Amino acid sequence: MAGICTTGTFSKAEASVIPYSVIGVHEFDLPVKYDPFNVILSYNIYNDDRNAWGGPSGGQDSLLTINKFAHFFKVDALPNVGFLWELVLGGASVRLKNDDSVSGMIDPQVGIVSWIRPLPNWTTALEYWLYVPFGDNEISNHAIDNSVAFLTNYTLGGLTFDGDFGIKLRGDSHYNGVKQERGDLLFGNLSLAYKFIPNVEPFVKLDWVSAGKGKDLGSGATVASSDETAIGIGNHFSLTQKLAADVWYLRGVDGRNNTKTDAVYLKFAYIF
């Protein structure tokens, strides 16, 4: 079953969600010989936000749901190249230290992916995302963001490797009269799995993000840069030929000026 990639963050808990940390097993194992088809994916993340790197945390916990529709299509002039376009809608709920909570729609995303298979068991791809500030006021980043990432998958027998490296270019945010320059993000993610028998395909993960410093454009105050590295463990389930699921636990092991990752991820993918 082909995997599909996505990334999503939101303002109140952005620091606790590493970009592309939602990638699971076979995420970038994409076909090049196919008739057009569709995939629905649901990514669900619960994070304990009570701890932070290098300072107090402002939250208790957060729940993020990312729902994506992806359409695979072909270009006749490029028979050995695969393409898909994708749309993401979702919601977030964040509980703060004072027991107040905010919830609503995250900023929608639209994207496109193109890929080739240099070898029968090796995929390389490029993905572009546009983030538009149409989410609810207390959830939105209030900025137009763009990201681009290199993606790869390699399989050898029961062994599967997925990885990516990318950059997210974050626009200036405008909210409640405050204009803020936000630092860009660099990120990388690795996933390594081994299939013993059907539905027993454990995997380990390594996720990393580094955010550049920003600035309050009104006061001139600097917003500190931040970074985090997290590791995870989970299992991939091939439930049917059209339905798959991944579940894993991800925990931050090093970081700075950031909410500590302490999260459970659950992913479903359905082909139709």
Regions found by a protein language model. Name each.
Residues 2-12:
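C-terminal segment of classical bacterial N-terminal signal peptides
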Residues 54, 138, 175, 216, ...:
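Outer-membrane beta-barrel and related beta-rich outer-membrane complex signature
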Residues 131-139, 168-179:
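Surface-exposed cleft-lining segments at the edges of enzyme active sites
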